């Protein structure tokens, strides 16, 4: 059984026991997170739309995103030719690591 969920503007294909990195939620470790934005569920047959309107996915936070869980730095470099103008910026995304515990249809 798997489900396709939408969390933080991204879509993930998850099943029970999966561990994934989602955008920072502000939840502490071992707190429960309920995701109600379910796009599809496959339990032998694929259900989408109104059939999954009351479906939800429960997850538990493995590690919170404060300080430790930061993604690799992405460098943004902009150069304007012939203008002697350049800009270099870095960005590190904070994320929360969760484990999917239950998929309820």
UniProtKB/Swiss-Prot annotation:
SUPFAM superfamilies registered for this protein in UniProt: L21p-like
Pfam families referenced in this protein's UniProt entry, alphabetically: Ribosomal_L21p
Molecular-function GO terms, alphabetical: rRNA binding; structural constituent of ribosome
GO biological process: translation
GO CC annotations, alphabetized: cytoplasm; ribonucleoprotein complex; ribosome
Disulfide bonds: none
Keywords: Ribonucleoprotein, Ribosomal protein, RNA-binding, rRNA-binding
Taxonomy, superkingdom: Bacteria
Function: This protein binds to 23S rRNA in the presence of protein L20.
Family named by the database record: Belongs to the bacterial ribosomal protein bL21 family.
Assembly and interaction partners: Part of the 50S ribosomal subunit. Contacts protein L20.
Full protein name: Large ribosomal subunit protein bL21
This protein's encoding gene: rplU
């Amino acid at each position: 059984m798997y489900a396709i969920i939408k969390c933080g503007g991204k879509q993930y294909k998850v099943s029970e026991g999966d561990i994934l990195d989602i955008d920072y939620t502000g939840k502490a470790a071992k707190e429960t997170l309920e995701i109600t934005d379910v796009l599809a569920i496959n339990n032998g047959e694929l259900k989408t739309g109104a059939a999954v309107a009351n479906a939800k996915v429960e997850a538990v936070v493995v590690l919170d995103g404060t300080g430790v869980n930061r993604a690799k730095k992405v460098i943004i470099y902009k150069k304007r030719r012939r203008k002697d103008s350049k800009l270099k910026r870095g960005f590190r995304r904070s994320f929360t690591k969760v484990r999917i515990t239950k998929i309820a249809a």
